[in-house]
């Protein structure tokens, strides 16, 4: 057979390794009486709806000692068991706080040291190991663990603020080894997560500084780089800029890269910031969500080392704007609790 005479067939686009959703609020939503419906209008557990539509990984946030128990360890064990039962992997996002951790808030948990870095580093190590050991004791495998959430401005303030990158490095090293030394049969991949994934200069500054010669944090301490990518906070947050940043991150630091938080609105009548120019043709609609997710998936899949995309809180019907100036960023209709057709786009990227 002369293979040269065979017609050239188009290559199928490979799906991303991780097509995920952060559904941390699920148990709270259900306690409030929300019952989700699938695309056929039938009531079904949210994790099963997601799995049926191609989503294969669940991200969930863990707070140390929240005042009302929301997102604590017991909460996360319950949620993770459901994700695993639905056939999905679990990505645990350690906030190292009793509440939200992000670029504007990195409050050290109550009872943890705020004046001695050695003590705090041990607390980070012991807490992280205890969390992972508890998952192991419950026979729940973890696919990946993020040591900190959106830590561009550091973590565990004040000791882990950006006026002391050696402290940041020490805390991250301690967290990483809490995972590595745990009783989990298979060590989860360890992820570092910054916001503004489109901003290569900010990403480069953080990683170059925290990994500087002599740093306690080394490249061997972590496996993955994750970024948040929200198009409604900055006109400079173009897909083109994200593509450049992801490619540079993967090549400069030798890590797989993921977009671990993202959204697109179905309604945004009065955006606080201008949307990026290369997304201006995408409507604020269910079809627009699908288009955005496909384009984003193409950018990540087209990056050497691009591994996945996670949609942040697609079903939080009590918080449809998800902290943005847009009215509704959900993949679920908050009037009917039925998933939108764009859920299939997330599972298909």
UniProtKB/Swiss-Prot annotation:
Protein biosynthesis keyword on record: no
Active site: 150, 261
Single GO BP term: cell wall organization
Keywords per UniProt: Carbohydrate metabolism, Cell wall biogenesis/degradation, Glycoprotein, Glycosidase, Hydrolase, Polysaccharide degradation, Secreted, Signal
Residues annotated as signal peptide: 1-15
Glycan attachment residues as annotated in the record: 126
Iron found in the keyword field: no
GO CC annotation: extracellular region
Enzyme class: hydrolase
Subcellular location: Secreted
GO MF terms held by the record: arabinogalactan endo-1,4-beta-galactosidase activity; glucosidase activity
Catalytic activity, EC: 3.2.1.89
Domain of life: Eukaryota
Record field: catalytic activity: The enzyme specifically hydrolyzes (1->4)-beta-D-galactosidic linkages in type I arabinogalactans
Chief location bin: secreted
Family: Belongs to the glycosyl hydrolase 53 family.
Function noted in UniProt: Endogalactanase involved in the degradation of plant cell wall polysaccharides, and more particularly of hairy regions of pectin.
Name of the protein in its database record: Probable arabinogalactan endo-beta-1,4-galactanase A
Origin organism lineage: Eukaryota, Fungi, Dikarya, Ascomycota, Pezizomycotina
Gene, per the UniProt record: galA
């Amino acid at each position: 057979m002369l293979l040269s005479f065979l017609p050239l067939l188009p290559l199928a686009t490979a799906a991303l390794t991780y097509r995920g959703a952060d559904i941390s609020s699920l148990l709270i939503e259900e306690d409030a009486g929300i019952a989700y419906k699938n695309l056929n209008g039938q009531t079904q557990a949210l994790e099963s709806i997601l799995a049926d539509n191609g989503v294969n990984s669940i991200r969930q946030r863990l707070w140390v000692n929240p005042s009302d128990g929301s997102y604590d360890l017991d909460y996360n064990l319950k949620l993770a068991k459901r994700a695993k039962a639905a056939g999905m992997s679990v990505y645990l996002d350690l906030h190292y706080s009793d509440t939200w951790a992000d670029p504007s808030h990195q409050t050290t948990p109550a009872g943890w040291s705020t004046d001695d870095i050695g003590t705090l580093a041990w607390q980070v190590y012991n807490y992280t190991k205890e969390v992972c050991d508890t998952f192991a004791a419950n026979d729940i495998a973890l696919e990946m663990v993020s040591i900190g959430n959106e830590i561009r401005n550091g973590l565990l303030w004040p000791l882990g603020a950006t006026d002391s990158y050696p402290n940041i490095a020490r805390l991250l090293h301690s967290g990483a080894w809490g995972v590595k030394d745990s009783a989990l049969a298979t060590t989860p991949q360890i992820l570092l997560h910054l916001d503004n994934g489109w901003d290569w200069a900010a990403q480069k500054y953080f990683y170059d500084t925290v990994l500087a010669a002599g740093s306690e944090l080394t490249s061997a301490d972590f496996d993955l780089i994750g970024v948040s990518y929200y198009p409604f906070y900055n006109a400079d947050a173009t897909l083109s800029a994200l593509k450049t940043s992801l490619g540079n991150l993967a090549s400069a630091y030798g890590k797989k890269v993921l977009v671990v938080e993202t959204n697109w609105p179905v309604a945004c009548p009065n955006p606080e910031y201008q949307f990026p120019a290369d997304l201006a043709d995408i409507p604020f609609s269910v079809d627009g969500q699908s288009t955005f997710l496909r384009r984003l998936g193409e950018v990540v899949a087209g990056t050497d080392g691009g591994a996945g995309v996670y949609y942040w809180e697609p079903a939080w019907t009590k918080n449809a704007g998800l902290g943005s100036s847009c009215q509704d960023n959900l993949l679920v209709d908050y009037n009917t609790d039925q998933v939108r057709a764009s859920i299939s786009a997330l599972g298909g990227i």
